[in-house]
UniProtKB/Swiss-Prot annotation:
Name of the gene this protein is made from: aroB
Coiled coil regions, renumbered to chain: none
Record-listed Zn(2+) binding positions: E185, H246, H263
Name the UniProt record assigns to this protein: 3-dehydroquinate synthase
Known cofactor(s): Co(2+); Zn(2+); NAD(+)
Binding site for NAD(+): G106, V107, I108, G109, D110, T130, S131, K143, K152
GO MF annotation: an example: metal ion binding
Protein's UniProt keywords contain Protein biosynthesis: no
């Protein structure tokens, strides 16, 4: 078992990483919640493997439990899904002294967390991330949000969980493409903050080797994010470094209506493209783009695409929340493991 504490004064919380944790959630929940009513949000895929198991375990430990099962995929993380969730909360007579559990990947964590933050002005929630992407990234840091038709995460808030409970064993049932999806975010951490970690990832020869080291991998990623979030909770400076690859990545996702590329695939493309553009413009010395390309290929992730309608991509980038007064902050690398923010504008991408 590994444990980290995100130190945010009265909003501090633990991240617990332990194989088999899905079978003993009640023990950890009891440490942070003394009530009896729990509402679980999950999706159809996760529910198939773990939904009833978690619900029955909680009921057997004396909790009054209701579960909502949503369709998997980014389309569910829509503003339009919220009324359905709020109505389920009302039917269950959920109060501010009760608890919500998000059992799923990044979509469920973001959507459920945002619903928790807004219903009755805030109900405590616990993250139980079941995808690699959620375990290493989206479940930590308190960013919760939903998408609008014109882009990702345009309606959201900062709302931290009471605890994050990570069981690496659940990754065994994760679809292969979503395991690769999560590896893109893992690679991102090496790119922006940890050169040694990046090159360690390059040494792994198989998925089995990655899984043999998965607790350490998750811990390293969560620890990097913990440090950044403690220094810049509200995303005004250093935390923006975590968005490496995301400016273009989010635009690619929206351009293809969130159904051609997974989030991680789009971020991988975004990481490579932004460094390649920077090298071509002479902002960075050549070399980093090829290293990123090589590791993306190693993990069977795409690194480049042809955009047929670049105007649509540029329009989406202009809506990016890092675009303030027409000044767009992008994340670049001095070298692998050394990242920095550069102020530019939309012309950078033309």
């Amino acid at each position: 078992m590994k444990e980290l504490v995100v130190d945010l004064k009265e909003k501090s919380y633990s991240i617990i990483i332990k194989k088999g944790l899905i079978n003993e959630l009640s023990n950890e929940i009891n440490k942070v919640y003394k009530g009896k009513k729990i509402f679980i949000l999950t999706d159809e895929n996760v529910n198939y493997h773990y939904g009833d198991k978690v619900k029955d375990s909680l009921i057997n430990n004396g909790y009054d439990v209701k579960k909502i099962v949503l369709k998997p995929g980014e389309e569910t993380k829509s503003f339009n899904t919220l009324p359905k969730i709020y109505n389920e909360f009302l039917d269950f007579k959920l109060t501010r002294s009760d608890l919500i559990i998000t059992l799923g990947g990044g979509v469920i964590g973001d959507l459920g967390g945002f619903a928790a933050s807004t219903f009755l002005r805030g109900i405590d929630f616990i993250q139980v991330p079941t995808s690699l992407l959620a375990q290493v990234d989206s479940s930590v840091g308190g960013k919760v949000a939903v998408d609008l038709d014109r882009g990702k995460n345009l309606v959201g808030s900062f709302y931290h969980p009471k605890v994050v409970l990570i069981d690496p064993d659940v990754l065994i049932t994760l679809e292969e493409k979503f395991f690769k999806d999560g590896m893109a975010e893992v690679i991102k951490y090496g790119c922006i903050k940890d050169k040694e970690f990046f090159y360690k990832l390059k040494e792994f020869k198989s998925k089995d080797e990655v899984l043999d080291n998965i607790e350490d991998i998750i811990y390293t990623c969560c620890n990097i994010k913990r440090i950044v979030v403690e220094n810049d909770e509200k995303d005004k400076g250093e935390r923006m470094l975590l968005n490496f690859g995301h400016t273009l990545g989010h635009a690619i996702e929206a351009y293809y209506n969130f159904n051609k590329y997974t989030h991680g695939e789009a971020v991988g493309i975004g990481m490579y493209k932004i460094i390649k553009i920077s090298e071509e413009k002479g902002i960075m010395p050549k070399g980093c783009a090829d290293e990123i390309k090589d590791i993306l290929i190693q993990y069977s992730l795409p690194y480049d695409i042809e955009i047929e309608n670049s105007d649509e991509i540029l329009e989406t980038i202009s809506l990016d929340k890092k675009n303030i007064n027409s000044v767009l902050k992008i994340v670049l690398l001095e070298s692998i493991g050394q990242s920095f923010l550069k102020s530019t504008n939309i012309e950078f991408f033309k």
